[in-house]
From Swiss-Prot:
Name this polypeptide is given: Cytochrome bo(3) ubiquinol oxidase subunit 3
Residue ranges that the UniProt entry lists as topological domain Cytoplasmic: 1-10, 74-81, 144-161
PANTHER family reported for this sequence: CYTOCHROME BO(3) UBIQUINOL OXIDASE SUBUNIT 3, CYTOCHROME C OXIDASE SUBUNIT III
Example GO molecular function: cytochrome bo3 ubiquinol oxidase activity
Species of provenance: Buchnera aphidicola subsp. Schizaphis graminum (strain Sg)
Oligomer and partners: Heterooctamer of two A chains, two B chains, two C chains and two D chains.
PROSITE patterns referenced in this protein's UniProt entry, alphabetically: COX3
Main location: membrane
Length: 189
């Protein structure tokens, strides 16, 4: 009974955190909508966004969501090798996504499309960057679970952490789908 209460408290706390993150991203999307409505972003978006590259980023992140979902399924089956596999797969897919995002930022800055050039670039870098920071912390979360799994084995506490991580990771995917649709697709199409 006490363990179930602790689990529910941790999940409730995570949901509160995720809802506060929703508010942050909602504000960022509102600012983006205001800025893009006052400026012809079509000229910028057609020149700077490589939709196939961003689609590959999206595909990688969605695959990481799939591996995270498989991790959640496996957490109760006590097969630690499979749990390691899905944690590492999710980590490397997330890292690939993050490196692609950093590469995209680097190319934009080389093309003189930095945040200091225009408000559009400022909000673009902010939205994508805030999402990237969340992915980075998700990767740290994976590393901490791997460390704990190595030293403690699979415990109820680790199962709860895996569930919390998976909820967080799926949240990041939902936010990225919004970024992809609202920022990239809306500007290019």
């Amino acid at each position: 009974m006490i363990k179930e209460t602790m689990r529910n408290n941790k999940l409730f706390g995570l949901w509160i955190y995720l809802m506060s993150d929703c508010i942050i991203f909602a504000v960022l999307f509102a600012v983006y909508a205001i800025i893009s409505s006052n400026f012809s972003t079509n000229l910028i978006n057609h020149k700077i966004f490589n939709l196939s590259y961003v689609f590959l980023e999206t595909l990688i992140l969605l695959l990481s969501s799939l591996s995270s979902g498989m991790l959640t399924i496996q957490k109760n089956k006590n097969n630690i090798k499979i749990i390691y596999f899905y944690l590492l797969l999710t980590f490397f897919l997330g890292l690939s996504f993050l490196l692609m995002e950093v590469n995209e930022f680097y190319k934009l800055i080389l093309e003189n499309c930095s945040p200091s050039q225009h408000a559009f670039f400022s909000i673009f870098f902010t939205i994508v960057g805030v999402h990237g920071i969340h992915v980075f912390f998700g990767l740290i979360f994976i590393l901490s679970i791997l460390y704990q799994l190595f030293y403690l084995g699979i415990t109820n506490t680790i199962r709860i952490r895996i569930l919390c991580f998976s909820l967080f990771w799926h949240f990041l995917d939902i936010i990225w789908i919004c970024v992809f649709t609202f920022v990239y697709l809306n500007g290019v199409i």
